[in-house]
Amino acid sequence: MKTCITKGIVTVSLTAILLSCSSAWAAGKGGIGLAATRLVYSEGEEQISLGVRNTSPDVPYLIQSWVMTPDNKKSADFIITPPLFVLNPANENLLRIMYIGAPLAKDRETLFFTSVRAVPSTTKRKEGNTLKIATQSVIKLFWRPKGLAYPLGEAPAKLRCTSSADMVTVSNPTPYFITLTDLKIGGKVVKNQMISPFDKYQFSLPKGAKNSSVTYRTINDYGAETPQLNCKS
């Protein structure tokens, strides 16, 4: 799914629109697409890579990339090369991401975000105005330590659910970040939610829910949904 939030400023001489999007080769007709919807950086790897594609037939883009922490601050613990480059029409390039920070938690994943901003070349109109549309794609980056007790594929079935009069609590006893999709409580659709390792999330019982039973899917390392599961108590 591709979602965008538009932040725009219009002036007499310049229209600047900043779009913040999540995409995987999802640029459509002319634009910038990424080769993944999420990245996994396994402990011990020297670097990982992310493909960037310009699907426009005639517009070059200036590409700038960085890694952010969950509180939306740039992380100094990662280097991305090249950090700034021009991506010509109908071309691709690889971003190489290297971790250079201090050791991270050994018993669980650590979450970061990879941000890729694309600014097209300027188009001048006859009346002298300039139109610029900049896109910013942000995807999750999971740093995964060695030696976790079991692989990610076994984690979704380990979620546990408890209920009270008007609340349902989903607990994640695993060392992985788990994103719940196609989430239903009592047969009613609930907004997707990511639960951190060894954490829990409380959902209000949806109006009209038949009961407090929970069914869900999750997202794997490749951005695909896993089979549906019934949450156990």
Swiss-Prot record:
Residues 1-26 form the signal peptide. It is found in: Periplasm. InterPro entries: Ig-like_fold, PapD-like_sf, Periplasmic_pilus_chap, Pili_assmbl_chap_C_dom_sf, Pili_assmbl_chaperone_bac, Pili_assmbl_chaperone_C, Pili_assmbl_chaperone_CS, Pili_assmbl_chaperone_N. One of its GO terms (cellular component) is outer membrane-bounded periplasmic space. Keywords: Chaperone, Fimbrium biogenesis, Immunoglobulin domain, Periplasm, Signal. The operon is cryptic under classical laboratory conditions, but is functional when constitutively expressed. Induction: Expression is negatively regulated by H-NS and subjected to cAMP receptor protein (CRP)-mediated catabolite repression. Belongs to the periplasmic pilus chaperone family. The keyword Signal applies. PANTHER family: FIMBRIAL CHAPERONE PROTEIN ELFD-RELATED (PTHR30251:SF0), PILUS ASSEMBLY CHAPERONE (PTHR30251). This is Probable fimbrial chaperone protein ElfD. The gene is elfD. Pfam families: PapD_C, PapD_N. One of its GO terms (molecular function) is protein folding chaperone. It comes from the Bacteria. Part of the elfADCG-ycbUVF fimbrial operon, which promotes adhesion of bacteria to different abiotic surfaces. Could be required for the biogenesis of the ElfA fimbriae. GO terms for biological process: cell wall organization; chaperone-mediated protein folding.
